[in-house]
């Protein structure tokens, strides 16, 4: 729904969208007296009748709580819909709840069609043979082995896939709540559970969210020269209270696996996440505990402890030691983004100590995607007992309204090994193609794996994508300006007509105010700040429109709404700041005030008095 659709009726009464019922009633009574057809001459009666009907319709909708609720959410089109909520005996609050439920159901259906079904496909490819120089071959006479150069065709024929993994999931809502937060969606998998943890978020608080749901997660993975390993998980998510959410997952195929996880927010700064994984009765369960606390405004410290595979006496002593105990500390630093209420990641650092793996890692968010530059760039480095020193770079950009394409490059130091990954995602679907490029330093591999793709991306961005993006932005801006100009012309004609209708009645009211020494508007001008005398289109005389607001020697203009929403004032065609100047007399003393476009005021005020 266009936002303007749920705004026009408020503009008809000259009110902000958060106007109270008393303000709606007061504005209606004042405007109905101004534009009542019986108070105008015969040549103005038709125009007054049209304006009066608009005001009458606006008041009928906005003064009715149920109609107002529908209009605020669906606009005029919603008023034409039979909502089936007019049951006798229903209170205004019950009607609001009924409408809210219908709105929430509609939103859930829209979200379900977009993100409830998710899938992820990963295919690992080994392309290191592309840069193999020689190959060892057996002598045909059986006199030993020699080497020879590989042909390009032979190199390409040696490229092969290493492994693939396909994972998909979908959710079925089982119950809803208007008060609970939405539990974060983290699918269980048969692999690592490190990504199952996330801090509780308050951004969805107060919205209608699923308080419990059932998720089905299927996964199939296979390595070269090995059997396919399928798995199916059923995961039940519930949120019994705003501070607590829990999940329990069951493996429906052998080997049996049960996973239990909870997220508990102790307060607004501290959370704890315990996770237990049970894989049969022959070994003790594995556990992971995460404790996090917000230390600074944008900084959070997280501690994670994993038991790994362990034994208690003879219980579990025969189990393979695939994942041993570890402890890690992570600091996550966010940063504020202009014109955004949600902070974004700036950098994070992690230190891990364990029996099988120990290391440090640091990631820095170099650039966030913006409207002018849709690229997001991240840099990272890590050093561990398993992979040595690794340096990585990741860049991604939107290639459509819902699609994102990204490239990740990782370089091993000092071996010079290169691995890069191509990633594509659209809504809940994701495809990853990790490519093993070279295992040792090779100039050809570095050129084709680093220099060529980076320069190609920069060249395409600089000489093709960026000019095209700027051209589209310019074209869209011109279209918006033309649309605004057409709308401004229509509103200008309507405002001039309204001033003509009000002028005679307002002048009579001002004459009465003058006779009793009340509030008299001498002059009012709505203009662009610092506009020159040779720019008549950037200012307008609004004396009649402001004087029409005077009631019983008082004038009130609400805040947070543009002055162009006042009856008889049309928008000025400019992106610059606007202001309203009012010169008035009260008790035969002159006053003057200059207001910003969305600044409220109550007249008269001693602060506005002009000192002689």
Swiss-Prot record:
Give the membrane topology.
Single-pass membrane protein
Bilayer-crossing residues are 445-465
Recite the UniProt keywords alphabetically: Chaperone, Membrane, Transmembrane, Transmembrane helix
Xref: Gene3D superfamilies: DnaJ domain
Does the keyword Protein biosynthesis belong to this entry?
no
Instruction: Name where it's found.
Output: Membrane
Q: Specify the J domain's residue ranges.
A: 8-75
Primary location class? membrane
Query: Which cellular component terms (GO) are annotated to the entry?
Result: MIB complex
Xref: Pfam families: DnaJ (PF00226), DnaJ-like_C11_C (PF11875), DNAJC11_beta-barrel (PF22774)
The UniProt entry, under PROSITE patterns, shows: DNAJ_1, DNAJ_2
One biological process term from GO is: cristae formation
User: Which PANTHER family does the entry mention?
Assistant: DNAJ HOMOLOG SUBFAMILY C MEMBER 11
The similarity annotation says: Belongs to the DnaJ family.
Protein name as it appears in the record:
Uncharacterized J domain-containing protein C63.03
């Amino acid at each position: 729904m266009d936002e303007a659709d749920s705004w026009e009726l408020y503009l008809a009464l000259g009110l902000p969208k958060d106007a109270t019922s008393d303000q709606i009633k007061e504005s209606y009574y004042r405007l109905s007296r101004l534009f009542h057809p019986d108070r105008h001459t015969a040549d103005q009666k038709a125009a007054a009748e049209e304006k009066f009907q608009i005001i009458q319709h606006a008041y009928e909708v906005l003064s009715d709580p149920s109609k107002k609720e529908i209009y605020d959410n669906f606009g005029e089109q919603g008023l034409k819909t039979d909502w089936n909520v007019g049951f006798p005996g229903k209170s205004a609050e019950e009607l609001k709840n009924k409408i809210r439920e219908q709105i929430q159901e509609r939103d859930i259906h829209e979200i379900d069609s977009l993100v409830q079904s998710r899938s992820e496909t990963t295919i690992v490819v080994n392309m290191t043979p592309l840069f193999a120089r020689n190959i060892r071959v057996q002598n045909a006479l059986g006199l030993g082995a020699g080497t020879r150069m590989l042909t390009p065709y032979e190199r390409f024929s040696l490229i092969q896939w290493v492994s693939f993994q396909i994972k998909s999931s979908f959710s079925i809502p089982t119950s809803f709540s208007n008060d609970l937060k939405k539990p974060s969606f983290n699918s269980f998998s048969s692999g690592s559970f490190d990504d199952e943890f996330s801090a509780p978020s308050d951004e969805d608080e107060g919205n209608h969210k699923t308080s419990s749901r059932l998720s089905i997660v299927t996964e199939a993975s296979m390595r070269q020269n090995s059997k396919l390993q399928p798995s199916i998980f059923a995961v039940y998510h519930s949120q019994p209270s705003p501070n607590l959410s829990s999940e329990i997952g069951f493996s429906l195929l052998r080997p049996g696996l049960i996973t239990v996880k909870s997220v508990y927010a102790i307060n607004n700064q501290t959370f704890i996440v315990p996770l237990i994984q049970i894989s049969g009765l022959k070994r003790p369960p594995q556990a992971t505990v995460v404790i996090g606390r917000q230390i600074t405004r944008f900084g959070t410290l997280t501690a994670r402890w994993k038991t790994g595979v362990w034994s208690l006496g003879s219980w579990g002593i025969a189990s393979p030691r695939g994942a041993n105990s570890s402890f890690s500390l992570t600091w996550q630093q966010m940063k504020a983004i202009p014109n955004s209420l949600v902070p974004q990641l700036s950098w994070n650092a992690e230190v891990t100590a364990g029996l099988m793996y120990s290391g440090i890692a640091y990631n820095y968010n170099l650039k966030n995607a913006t409207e002018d530059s849709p690229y997001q760039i991240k840099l990272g480095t890590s050093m561990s007992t398993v992979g040595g020193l690794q340096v990585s770079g990741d860049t991604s950009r939107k290639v459509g309204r819902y699609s994102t394409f990204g490239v990740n490059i990782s370089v091993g130091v000092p071996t010079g090994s290169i691995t890069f990954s191509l990633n594509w995602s659209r809504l809940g679907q994701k495809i990853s193609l990790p490519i093993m490029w070279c295992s040792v330093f090779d100039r050809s591999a570095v050129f084709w794996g680093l220099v060529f793709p980076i320069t190609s991306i920069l060249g395409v961005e600089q000489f093709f994508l960026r000019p095209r993006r700027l051209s589209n932005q310019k074209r869209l801006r011109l279209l918006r300006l033309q649309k605004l100009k057409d709308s401004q012309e229509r509103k200008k004609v309507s405002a001039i007509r309204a001033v003509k209708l009000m002028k005679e009645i307002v002048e009579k009211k001002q004459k009465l105010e003058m006779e009793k020494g009340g509030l008299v508007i001498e002059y009012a001008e709505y203009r662009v700040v610092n506009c020159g005398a040779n720019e008549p289109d950037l200012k307008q005389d609004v004396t009649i429109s402001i004087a029409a607001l005077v009631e019983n020697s008082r004038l009130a203009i609400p805040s947070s709404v543009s002055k162009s929403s006042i009856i008889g004032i049309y928008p000025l065609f400019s992106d610059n700041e606007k202001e309203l100047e009012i010169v008035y007399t009260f008790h035969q003393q002159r006053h003057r005030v200059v207001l910003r476009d969305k600044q409220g005021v109550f007249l008269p005020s001693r602060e506005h008095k002009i000192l002689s």
